[in-house]
Amino acid sequence: VSLIKKDIALRYGASVLSLKKEDILFHEGDTANFFYQVEDGAIKMVTYSLDGKEFIQGLFYQGDCFGEPPLFCDFKYPGSAVTLIESKILRIPKDRFFDLLKENFDVHLQLDRILCERLRYKNMILSEISFYDPEHRILSLLGYLKSKAPVSDQPFQVPLTRQQLADMSGMRVETVIRTIKRMEESGKLQIQDHKIFF
């Protein structure tokens, strides 16, 4: 379910961007001038270390909004937004987005809930990295990713590489590979054609 219905967004000056896989919507350090919502497709928010290592801050699917905090606090984007697949992104200019929030309290309240949920996720990741063994970290991360994906009666296909799972969970890729193999052997997940299903 989208935070902002498309007809309402269009009344506030929204446009829809069509992007290809691996297109960059905005870069870390850019000024935030728009509210963004996924109409179709998937986005990852990432930061990069000095040696080029990618850390995935979040994944966003159809109906999800992303990149809002800099709109409210006037700081630069702390990460880059990159498409995982071909995507359509709804975008509303910052000033019109604030008008929309002022005139639609239900949207404002729902956005508050979304931001609180993201804080909860960040807290979970910090706890996982600090206190738990690799299998627990991976199970928690896969459970979270599955909860964010569209509901399906099929096993959830993890849209990340083992390197990306390592980057999100604070582990080395070798540890993730060994742990996933053990989890497959114990029936906690499946691997088909090198893809992870949970």
Task: Locate the predicted segments by residue.
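Short proline/glycine- and basic residue-enriched helix-capping loop/turn segments at helix->loop/beta transitions
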Residues: S2-K21
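Cyclic-nucleotide recognition modules
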Residues: D7, Y12, Q57-C116, R120
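Conserved catalytic Walker-motif region of ABC-type ATPase nucleotide-binding domains
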Residues: L19, V38, F198
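Cyclic nucleotide-binding regulatory domains
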Residues: D23-I85
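Short helix-to-loop capping/linker segments positioned immediately adjacent to catalytic or ligand/cofactor-binding
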Residues: F98-L101, Y121-F131, A149-S152
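Short amphipathic alpha-helical elements of helix-turn-helix/winged-helix folds
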Residues: L141-L145
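Phosphate-/nucleic-acid-contacting segments
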Residues: K146-F198
